[in-house]
Amino acid sequence: ATNEHFKDKNSFFIPSSEMMYLLPNQVAVALSQAQSIPQADVRTKMQDAILYSLKSEILREKAETDCSRCLIDTSPFFSGGTHLVWHSTDALIVPVRTDQQSINSLNLLLKLFSSPASEFRRCMPSDGHMPKIQMVVLTHCGWSTRAGARNEPNQQTRMYIQQVLDIVSRNIQSFTTNDPTNHIVLLDDFLGSGRISSARSEPIELLHAGETMTIHRTKVEVNKSVEKVKNQLRFISSCLW
């Protein structure tokens, strides 16, 4: 099916699959079998073929569709797929919500990258490829309502910004530059705009304040903050490409 909002663009979408739930076990079995091969050169070749299998498919698809960019949305629940994605990327974008559980998840991710004992580090491609993080997007940020305040995070958001900054600083080797401030961007809660965008499969860039839609018998509205969100998303895009 074609998304009408992308009809004039050279863009293609490859959906996920319920088979992704089986992939972690399949990848683990394949890597285990490859590691048991006695000939070192054959063993290395097989491991590289497995770890770079998704990258090979992406490069083939890009050539066939004449696309220059590829974005992959992955999840820790698809650990095998996530493992292959990490070896397919030039850089990672890590969304972190303004809550402690998300902060803990960021710490866990960076530990997976840095610890030699982690599942991810135990089996590496022969060229030693390690993914680098380009950006941590701190989502659902709140802003000060103090008179005269402009684009000033509220106290709770400032607390999470500081935590993320500390984490990035301690793990700067996992990022694409040596300056922690290059890698943290803030994003508002999308509110109704996000729900309508998802329901319609329509980019937020095309939404306008005042639009309404009924979702699960609840009336949802695009509020005025959508213009601020658009600017934030444009800035994030400019930092990526």
Give the positions of each predicted feature:
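C-terminal lobe/tail of nucleotide-utilizing enzymes
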Residues: 123-241
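Conserved catalytic-core segment of NTP-binding enzymes
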Residues: 48-174
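Cytosolic-facing regulatory segments adjacent to core modules
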Residues: 1-7, 12-72, 78
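Aromatic-enriched hydrophobic runs in primary sequence
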Residues: 1, 9, 56, 64-76, ...
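Phosphate/oxyanion-binding active-site loops and adjacent basic polyanion-contact surfaces
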Residues: 42-54, 101-109, 225-240
